[in-house]
UniProtKB/Swiss-Prot annotation:
GO terms for molecular function: magnesium ion binding; phosphoglucosamine mutase activity; phosphomannomutase activity. It comes from Mycolicibacterium gilvum (strain PYR-GCK) (Mycobacterium gilvum (strain PYR-GCK)). It comes from the Bacteria. Belongs to the phosphohexose mutase family. Binds 1 Mg(2+) ion per subunit. Pfam families: PGM_PMM_I, PGM_PMM_II, PGM_PMM_III, PGM_PMM_IV. GO terms for biological process: carbohydrate metabolic process; peptidoglycan biosynthetic process; UDP-N-acetylglucosamine biosynthetic process. This is Phosphoglucosamine mutase. Keywords: Isomerase, Magnesium, Metal-binding, Phosphoprotein. The active site is at 102 (phosphoserine intermediate). The modification Phosphoserine is found at residue 102. Its cofactor is Mg(2+).
Amino acid sequence: MARLFGTDGVRGVANRELTPELAMALGSAAARRLGRAGATRRRVAVVGRDPRASGEMLEAAVIAGIAGEGVDTLRVGILPTPAVAYLTSAYDADFGVMISASHNPMPDNGIKIFGPGGHKLDDATEDRIEELVHQGPGERPTGAGIGRVVDAEDALERYLRHVGKAATTRLDPLTVVVDCAHGAASVAAPRAYRAAGANVIPIHADPDGLNINDGCGSTHMESLRSAVVSYGADLGLAHDGDADRCLAVDAHGRVIDGDAIMVVLALAMQQSGELVSDTLVATVMSNMGLHLAMRSADIEVRTTGVGDRYVLEELRAGQFSLGGEQSGHIVLPSFGTTGDGIVTGLRLMARMAQTGRSLADLAQPMQTLPQVLINVEVADKTTVADAPSVRDAVAQVEAELGDTGRILLRPSGTEQVVRVMVEAADEDTARQMAVRVADSVSAES
């Protein structure tokens, strides 16, 4: 049986894979596993969602499952995923649930569960919740033992007060275009940036339940790039559907990705003494240019597997203060337990305001190396990388690249392919080396 939980919760097409029945079962299982046993007070869960059309249906189902186990729900409505994580801690709730499929298309939806303190669940806890889903419900409470539902009317204001602390200086000189992806950031992001003093021009901030991520947001930045240039803005910020990501655009319309944002923030935090152990946490997908920029600043880069959960694990293990992904998931543990796109935007603009420098200038140390990616169909994606001929080809490329590039072989998580990625000083070199290794992989399949 396929595992329910993926790298970021449970996802699928709403009302097909992710049905109301499954949502209710997940709510029930989460309540049984995470509701604090023996608590003298009533147990509480925080539930939020993004604006997509299926959110109301799945929210009702999740809450029914939670209430059926005798756990109360604080319903916070449409808010960013990091807001639900923060409020789980702020309200001292037993757990939190966010109903969102992040940057995925509108027909999809997902369920993310946060444990006490707003932390993402570990694999063992997810496995136990999955077991409880398959077991089905046990004996349920009746009468006064059934969970109640309360709308948390102060949820947005509490979250905005919290993220406002990320703006370490006033942003009055700056004009920013904000692409809200018709998602959970549509109210929160413009309000947060205006409260810090920025002149805000929101775009794609009119969610109707159907238009989330539709040609907009952090995965479709063309309209933001055009808007920044046409308005003469200092920068643009793009969020995804649940606002845990932030990518940027400089005044010339050039995209500043998560790697470049991490470089800007790492250098700023090193200067202010906030960068714990002069260490940044990034995934294997970060460009070699990030490593070179950090090396020149004597900043160590700790590398993890793909996924912000692995970044979070390394941050917690080493008590580090900054980590993230090229995709724009940037984690600042002093401000939250997960990536927060609005906090990222505030910190980025604060650096611009403090220094008086443009975003293009601040991001200049990050020089992205040309990257070539080849997908190779294989019979067994788990073993082909260990074939002697493949290992020899990889070793030869690594020797030729030295410290001027890198090669990465990675089995796809969703397809029967191995991804061969090479970064080098020029694209021709990267392509030649990638083809050489891809040919060796293909020959073994």
